[in-house]
Amino acid sequence: MKRETFAIADIYVPIKRRATLDQKRVDEIATSMLDKGQQAPILVRADGARFVLVEGLHRLEAAKALGEKTIFCFLVDARRH
């Protein structure tokens, strides 16, 4: 897979996924991102003009908390559940 950069605003987080958010984990990852940058890309799948988060909710939310406009992603071919 090739690492790509996507606009955070173009990534949709499913409601079920949002329910699993742990703010403490987001804060820990944000601190790590400040020190080391984003270490692991998130996974997204294409859905028309937008992208849907497959994996990496806490990394995505940490990037948002830091005011980032883009994030490293891997575009995967995943099916809806």
What do these predicted ranges mean?
Residues 1-77, 81:
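Short, charged/polar connector segments at secondary-structure boundaries
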